[in-house]
Amino acid sequence: MISKRLELVASFVPQGAILLDVGSDHAYLPIDLVERGKIESAIAGEVVEGPYQSAVKNVEAHSLKEKIQVRLANGLAAFEESDQVSVITIAGMGGRLIARILEEGLDNLANVERLILQPNNREDDLRIWLQENEFQIVAESILEEAGKFYEILVVKAGQMKLSASDVRFGPFLSKEVSPFFVQKWQKEAVKLEFALGQIPEKNLEERQVLVDKIQAIKEVLHVSK
């Protein structure tokens, strides 16, 4: 049984894909997708020995060694062109780390049809990197699990031009304005309002930065001033 977060990631994996799951931990995601008959085969990549061994044992326990290869490798070094990987998932890492993994493996991405990225933070930095490196966001989603909000970015090769609002809030999420999106940014606005209250009135520039951030949230949530 996988988490709601991984379920949502899995929902964006196309039928019949050949998957690379980077930072696969216990290989939960590839195991789930293979057992449901959604994907042909998978590579579970892990850079840390402990999680790598856990993934190996888990794949063996599910009798899926023929379908899922577990590889000890750093990021996108876990696959080669001959593997014919069509989809890559990178979930549960910081946005900057995901960008770095993609940066280091950029040459490996030429034939990959789709990236499904689930950053735990710094989604804005990841979006900027994608734009600068000619990747295009084609879908986004958001959910809440155990009190945390998670955003998912579905990406393919292509150009996009993001506004400052798109970078911060997401080009699709900010248009859909789902209940989870509203909850996330209402919570963030409360934190910013509190922080603003701690800054002396004389610190005009510092205060203005927070005022602008709060105003941007109000605008994207369609809240009147």
Regions found by a protein language model. Give the residues of each.
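Conserved SAM-binding loop of SAM-dependent methyltransferases across substrates and taxa
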Residues: H26-I39
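S-adenosyl-L-methionine
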Residues: M1-G16, I31, Q53-S82
